[in-house]
Every structure is written in C-alpha cells, then in structure tokens.
Amino acid sequence: MDIKPKKYKPTKEEYIKSFKDMLLLRRFEEKCGQLYGMGEIGGFCHLYIGQEAVISAVDTVKQKGDSTITSYRDHAHIILAGTEPKYVLAELMGRATGCSKGKGGSMHLFDIPNKFYGGHGIVGAQVPIGTGLAFAEKYNGTNNICFTFLGDGAVNQGQVYEAFNMAALWGLPVVYIIENNEYSMGTSVARSTFMRDLYKKGESFGIKGFQLDGMDFEEMYNGAKQAAEYVRENSFPLILEVKTYRYRGHSMSDPAKYRSKEEVEQYKERDPLVIIRKTILDNKYATEADLKEIEQSVKEIVKEAVKFSENSPLPDEGELYTEVYC
C-alpha cells in the first residue's frame, strides 16, 4: 500500500484537541516520574515522553467502537482511550480507586467500557490478543477495527508472526502499529534484527505496511487515517511502523547509558510538542494566550489527579483473592 502524502490534514479543532492531549500526556508522565522518585509509585514504570504524537494521531482517527491494546508502556494509550487521568494515576499508586483496583499497576491498565484491553507485561503477548479482538469484530459483523500497538523489540517474538499469519489467513480488521523508538530495552534495532524496515515484517504473509515519522503529528494523522481506512474497507491487516523516540530510559530504573546525550538532544530538536505548537501558531489556529490557557488547564488536571490519588484508600486485603484465575 502506498500512502498518499497530505491526503488528509487535521482540522483546526483536531489540532487544538491534539495539542492539549499531547501536553496532558507529557505533564502526566513527568509527574509520574517525579512520584516514582519519591517512592509514591512502586514496581516498574515505563514513560511515554517523546512519543506523544503517535497515540494522539491514532486516537484522532479512531471511530467509536474501535479497540486499543498495547504493551506495558501504556499510560498514554489508556488516557486517550477515555479513562480519566486520576484513575490511571490512582492505579499507578496502588489505590483502590485505580482503573484496575490498585492491583495492576503501571503495566496492567485496563478499561473495558472504553475498549482498552491493556497494558501487557510480556513482550509481544498483546499482539495475538489484539488479533483476537479483531476476529471478534469480524465475527460479530461490526465495522470496528483493533489498533494493536507493539514495540520494535516485540517484532522478533514468535507469537507475533503467528498472529500475523492468522490475521492474514482470516482477513481480520487489525492495524498493527510498531512504535519503533530505536531501542528494545538497551538493545538497538540494528543489533537485534536483520530486516531494519520493520513495516516489511509482514510481507511473507501478504500484509502491506509503511513507515511514518512518529514525531510529526500531521504526518502521523495522514498515515493513520489512511491505514484505518484501508483495514476497515478491506477487512485485512496492515502494519504501520512509526519512527519515534523515548527521551527517558526504558523504565524508571534504566539510566540509558547505551546511548549518548548528543543522540537524545538531537531527537529533542524535533520534539512533537514543539512541532504541533509551531504549526498551530503559524496557521493562526490559536494565539499564545490560548495555548497558555490550555497549559494551565492541563496543569490543573494533573494536580487534581495527584490529589485524588493521594486521598484514595489502599485496596482491602480481600481484593487479593478476587479476579484470580488459573
């Protein structure tokens, strides 16, 4: 499939909403990093800082009824799926009011009413499940699709290719989105896979794919909209590789010494928030005062999330024995 450049362009309203969404994700993740350092968040914590344009664009082109599933770097995905940030932060802080009742933590966020199916701690494990979600949509005769996110490290997992094969064989409406942030934990793409154009990983199954600049919201929007259109119309999978970058380590416990400060700064020069902000101002979609007002509202949302979470109770001990399956 060939992506047509600039076939679709975000509207003024979509630009403004996405700027607010991306800023909220950035400030939320920054606060999570701060709270983790203070010992308020335990366990693993994988931040999405730097990658905000990817999920924001996908969320903008999603239709009501579409589902989302991803890996353990999932805070941003569940928030844009419709979960209030305060319930996400409460979960990270292990509170009973969290979206997973304080039992899932950072890596296992769920919101079934908003069709967000995790949050999965096993690398690549969400891909067969996302394929199954797409099967359910086809079986039930809907026109919904499933956006299944995975990282560059997950593309080397065997179960991913089993899922690709099944999706192609049965013609399932799933968009596989590879968030290629260059490093699988500390291992670069160049050191982990021979085929570095990850969007070509499905070619042997007849699955088309293409690559996008994940730091550019407008390019992401155009590509994601065409990808969703293709999958919805053809009831057939497609692979979307987005080149992006995480500014922080793999997790909060990772000092990221496998890459240079110069490399990180080079990517920060193309910060997705800076790009979308400049586009909005250049096109006179909003003024500096308008954007500052948005920034203040985002600050209040994060502040309220912290207050809500701190004042929420810990789960009752009896919760240890609920929702346990074997």
UniProtKB/Swiss-Prot annotation:
GO terms for cellular component: intracellular membrane-bounded organelle. Its cofactor is thiamine diphosphate. The keyword Oxidoreductase applies. GO terms for molecular function: pyruvate dehydrogenase (acetyl-transferring) activity. It comes from the Bacteria. SUPFAM superfamilies: Thiamin diphosphate-binding fold (THDP-binding). One of its GO terms (biological process) is pyruvate decarboxylation to acetyl-CoA. It catalyses: N(6)-[(R)-lipoyl]-L-lysyl-[protein] + pyruvate + H(+) = N(6)-[(R)-S(8)-acetyldihydrolipoyl]-L-lysyl-[protein] + CO2. Keywords: Oxidoreductase, Pyruvate, Thiamine pyrophosphate. It is an enzyme of class 1 (oxidoreductase). InterPro entries: DH_E1 (IPR001017), PDH_E1_Alpha_Subunit (IPR050642), Pyrv_DH_E1_asu_subgrp-y (IPR017597), THDP-binding (IPR029061). Its EC number is 1.2.4.1. It holds the Pfam family E1_dh. Gene3D superfamilies: 3.40.50.970. Heterodimer of an alpha and a beta chain. PANTHER family: PYRUVATE DEHYDROGENASE E1 COMPONENT SUBUNIT ALPHA, PYRUVATE DEHYDROGENASE E1 COMPONENT, ALPHA SUBUNIT BACTERIAL AND ORGANELLAR. The pyruvate dehydrogenase complex catalyzes the overall conversion of pyruvate to acetyl-CoA and CO(2). It contains multiple copies of three enzymatic components: pyruvate dehydrogenase (E1), dihydrolipoamide acetyltransferase (E2) and lipoamide dehydrogenase (E3). This is Pyruvate dehydrogenase E1 component subunit alpha.
